[in-house]
Each structure stands twice: as C-alpha cells, then as structure tokens.
Amino acid sequence: MTRIGTPLSPTATRVLLCGCGELGKEVVIELQRLGVEVIAVDRYANAPAMQVAHRSHVVNMLDGVALRAVIEAEKPHYIVPEIEAIATATLVELENEGFNVVPTARATQLTMNREGIRRLAAEELDLPTSPYHFADTFEDYAKAVADVGYPCVVKPVMSSSGKGQSLLRSDADLQKSWDYAQEGGRAGKGRVIVEGFIDFEYEITLLTVRHVGGTTFLEPVGHRQEKGDYQESWQPQAMSPKALAESQRVAKAVTDALGGRGLFGVELFVKGDQVWFSEVSPRPHDTGLVTLISQDLSQFALHARAILGLPIPVVRQFGPSASAVILPEGQSQQTSFANLGAALSEPDTAIRLFGKPEINGTRRMGVCLARDESVELARAKATRASQAVKVEF
C-alpha cells in the first residue's frame, strides 16, 4: 500500500530527479501534486525542473562519486533518471545497496547507449530491427557501411536528440558522416552504430506504462523529425489493427525485459502491417508532450502514478491532438516570448514555456499544443500557434 508523507518533514516521500529538462519539469509538477518532496539534480543551475522542485543540486551526473555523494546525503525513496547521460554503473551499485532506481538500474544502463538496447531487442528478444553493425574506428565503420549497404544511417552509440545522426547514400558521404557522428557523441569520439535504412511509411512512439495493475498502452503518437530533433507530434497516429497489435507486442516484450515501474517511450518504424523496433527510453518522451492536451492523464502524470505504485484504472483520450515546438535560434540569458495572445487565440490550444535559463544556438524553448476534429486540423492549429510566438533575445 502506498503511503505518502508530508514534504519537508520526517515523514516525507522523497524523489531525486537526475536531469532537469522540460520533461523532468512536468514530472516534478505531477509529483508535487501528489505531495512528494522533490530534489532536482543537473549539471547546470536553474534548469527547468529545478524551478519547481523543493531544492536542487548542480552536479556532473557522469561523475559517479559526486552523484553518489548527493544521493547518500538526500536518501531519496526513489531515484528517477530523466536523461541518459548519467553514471549508470553508480546507479547499479546504489540499487544493489537498497536504493530504488526507476524503472530499474539495468534499464538505465541498457538504454544509456544504443548498443545495449539494440542487442537486447534483436539478439535476446528476437524482435524485428534494421540490420546493424557497430564500429570503433573509421576502417571498421567503412567495412560496416559496405556490409549494410546504401542507403544506411550512422549514429553515435551515445547521443541524445538525434545529435550526430546522418543518412549515407554513397561513398561521398562516408567521411563527413563519420566526422559528424564523432562530434555528436555524448562521450566525445567513439563507437557508432551503422543501420540499414528502413523504407518506412511513418514512425511512432508507443507510450507504454508498467504499473501496479499491469501494462497500459497509450494511443500511438506520430511525429516528424528534422536533423534528429522532434518538430511536431500528434495523437492518435492512424495505423492498421495488425500494425498496432504488433507494435504493442514489441513494446511489451522490450518493457517487460527492462522491468520496473514507470512510463516508457518505445520508438517504432511502421510500413503497412510491418513494424520494426528502433529505440526505447525508460522515461517520458519528448514526442509525448502532446499528451498534455490529448489525455486526462498526461505521460508525466502516468509516470508519477506508476513510480509511486498508484493504480491507473483508465486513461481517457480527449480527441485528435498535436504539439509543435517553439525552436528559436539565438543567444541570450534573458529570452522573452511575445505575441502569446495571438498564439492562444484559437479554442483548444495551450502553450508550455520551459523556462530554460539560456539559449546559445538553436534550442527547444517551449511547445504549443492543440486539439481539433482531426489530426490534420490539430497539427495545423498547433503549428499556427507555434509560428505566432515571437521570441526576443
């Protein structure tokens, strides 16, 4: 039975969040609504989730010693990773010592890099994926490309938001794609995955919740990417019954193998009735921001309930919905957003401004949300709202 105490008292139920971006911010808000004491940790000050947590610490989360020191001092009941770039070996040690890592330390370790999760899906679970090879050197990479054939995709095994990812169509792309992957990798130069290109019709995120009552699948989320970054998402994505059933089968197999409780974002490629596994995040997904307007319980509310062992008897869908990012380019530590009245002038629209403390280049600073009679109308409405927002530096 779940018991939640009083924040900032000896009975408090404490959650320590590792990573404090816009997704973590929404998770903190949902935990706050349930009376949880939240400690936010990230590598820079005033990150979005820190602004709504009870307190925060600035720590390099790839530094296992520093991360352990904060966790041992705070003694949280739950450790909730919000990003991949964490000293996962330290999380494994802490879990073995009795700390509760969400969903599990193994899940955070396997999904920290593309190799662990790809080998689990393809080699252990025998799920359909694109053909792939891993490579550490340019020579091995060139051989992997020759084996996989053109067109193919190269990605660093460790990166986020599509950084370092590119499509190769001929030998002319070999060197520049290698260089781009090396620049985009989170740990600097290093290992890459070369994948055969799947001629898919569309890609989806199947948000999957493992909770005290079993597994719940949300309506499939369609999305559009540019340079590996999500630009817009919508729900529900139209699919054949066979493709939806296969997507749920694949998602359940992967999330069961990772274990624990929480929300997972399972990324899949779809063509007709065929489905291929791509990646999985053991946490809320950026494309799932659409659930802030599409459902009675957003992906963040569902994650909070699942973590705390609270039931999820039903999730109600409100109708066709979409999200469109606010993605300015500039340099500032005092960004302002204007023309919000125009952006919110249509019915069934909403805006989330993330409160990121600075921008240096292109950065996702907010998202516009919309609901309408069809996905097409919702997408158009969300895009109009996003384009109406004026970002001032």
Curated annotation (Swiss-Prot):
Catalysis: reaction(s): N(1)-(5-phospho-beta-D-ribosyl)glycinamide + formate + ATP = N(2)-formyl-N(1)-(5-phospho-beta-D-ribosyl)glycinamide + ADP + phosphate + H(+)
Residues involved in Mg(2+) binding: E267, E279
GO cellular component: cytosol
GO molecular function, one term: ATP binding
Residues that bind N(1)-(5-phospho-beta-D-ribosyl)glycinamide: E22, L23, E82, D286, K356, R363, R364
EC numbers, comma separated: 6.3.1.21
Domain of life: Bacteria
Domain ATP-grasp stretches: 119-308
GO BP of this protein: 'de novo' IMP biosynthetic process
Keyword tags: ATP-binding, Ligase, Magnesium, Metal-binding, Nucleotide-binding, Purine biosynthesis
Pathway listed: Purine metabolism; IMP biosynthesis via de novo pathway; N(2)-formyl-N(1)-(5-phospho-D-ribosyl)glycinamide from N(1)-(5-phospho-D-ribosyl)glycinamide (formate route): step 1/1
InterPro entries found in the cross-reference section: ATP-grasp, ATP-grasp_carboxylate-amine, ATP_grasp_subdomain_1, PreATP-grasp_dom_sf, PurT, PurT/PurK_preATP-grasp, PurT_C
Residues that, per the record, bind ATP: R114, K155, S160, S161, G162, K163, G164, Q165, E195, G196, F197, I198, E203
Annotated family: Belongs to the PurK/PurT family.
HAMAP family named in the record: PurT
Function field: Involved in the de novo purine biosynthesis. Catalyzes the transfer of formate to 5-phospho-ribosyl-glycinamide (GAR), producing 5-phospho-ribosyl-N-formylglycinamide (FGAR). Formate is provided by PurU via hydrolysis of 10-formyl-tetrahydrofolate.
Subunit: Homodimer.
Protein name, UniProt field: Formate-dependent phosphoribosylglycinamide formyltransferase
